[in-house]
Each structure stands twice: as structure tokens, then as C-alpha cells.
Amino acid sequence: PNKATIIYHHGTNENPPEMSFNKILAGKGTAVPANLIFVRAPFNSSLRAFVASIAQARNYAAMLATSAVLIEGLVRRCREQGQGPILISGISLGGFVANLHHTYFNSADAYAPLLAGPLIEDVFLNSVYRKLVAAPDAEAEGRITRALSFAAEYAAVSHHNLFPLLARHDQYIRYDVQRAAYGPNVPVAVLEKGHVTGALAHDALRAHLLAVLNAGLKQTT
């Protein structure tokens, strides 16, 4: 019961959804010293379902919120059962969910979002991902920002338990933008990779999570 727990959320349209979870945490030979819980978001059963979901910003926001609330339910259940420290992580989409939970609940002992930042709206408005989004004018862009932004709420939270990882050459989760958004007091680990190559760096991602388990959780408990 005193063993640490990692709650992990998948990335966008992983196929199968638990692919990165298995590669980083649960695969043969990974030997992660923690209880592992995998979370899958709505609208991610197929690429078609995901693309249809992001046609409306409110659907995407609902997906994020649903995952964050589900994770909070898992945190409470772990507490009720007397489990040890809880680390919340996820990659890309899952990293944004981790940041969202950190912002609105902050009930876990530590957070390690991978390849994600606090400004999810930037992905849709300013990165190469913009071509998938129909935002032809300032009014439409404003709707996306209002639906997805949680920057003000993030700024009001203590970040002593936040240990993110970014990829310096990421064209989706732009390093300079997201690094600045985390704030000067948040220690951000950096991979010298892009988004896809960073997501495939399973050993490096696992090493980061193990470092948070070994050092980060001790700092926050």
C-alpha cells in the first residue's frame, strides 16, 4: 500500500492507445517501481473519431476536462485505499491533461507532463498543427483561446511539484513558448529532439519519470 502510483494518460491518437504507456512504463524489462494506472480519453478510438472531435473546440475542451476529472477520481480512490505517493504523467495530449489536473486539482504529489506545456491553444493557433484547424479569423481564434486556455488559472497555482519535459526542436509543442509559459521557477528537462523523435525516446522518457519518482516525490512529500 505504500508503493508509489503513476497515473499515465496517452497521447493523441496512439494506436493502440496504450502504446507509449507500454513502451515507457509497462513493457517487458521496464521494471518501474510503482503501481501503474492507464487512462484513455474520449474520442480516441480512431483517427477519424479524433479528427471529428477537434472540429469543435468545445468537444476538445470536454475531452480534456473529462480526462482530468477521471484522474481526480483515481487520485481520491488511491488516497482512500492508503496508497503511497502519486505521480501524474502523460505524453503530448496526456501531458496537457496532466497540466490541467495540476492547475485545477493539484491533488497529486508530483506531475511530470511529457512533451506538453501550459498553453494548449498555441498548438492549434501557432504551430504546424494549425493547418488542421479551421480558424480563418481573429474571432474564431478567440473562441479557441477561450475554450482551451487555462493560463490565468495555472499562474495562480504553486508549482513545487511540477517536473515537465519538453523537446527543444518540437514543431507542435513549441519549446520557447511552452518553456516560458511554465515560468522561471519550474525545472524543465529538455530532450534535443523533435516531437515524434522525442515521443520515441522511450528510455529517456522513462529515465525522467524515474528521476521524478526518486527525487521529485521525496521533495513534495
Task: Please place each PLM-identified region on the residue numbering.
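Short, surface-exposed "cap/lid" segments of acyl-processing enzymes
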Residues: 1-49
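Structural beta-sheet core signal
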Residues: 8, 88, 113, 164-166
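Active-site loop/turn elements of alpha/beta-hydrolase fold enzymes
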Residues: 39-43, 116, 193
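Short acidic/His/Gly/Ser-rich catalytic and metal-binding motifs that mark active-site loops
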Residues: 45-51, 120-124
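Alpha/beta-hydrolase active-site loop
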Residues: 49-50, 54-81
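Primarily recognizes the serine-hydrolase "nucleophile elbow" in alpha/beta-hydrolase
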Residues: 76-129
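The feature captures the conserved acid-bearing segment of alpha/beta-hydrolase catalytic domains
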Residues: 121-185, 189
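C-terminal catalytic histidine-bearing segment of alpha/beta-hydrolase fold enzymes
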Residues: 183-221
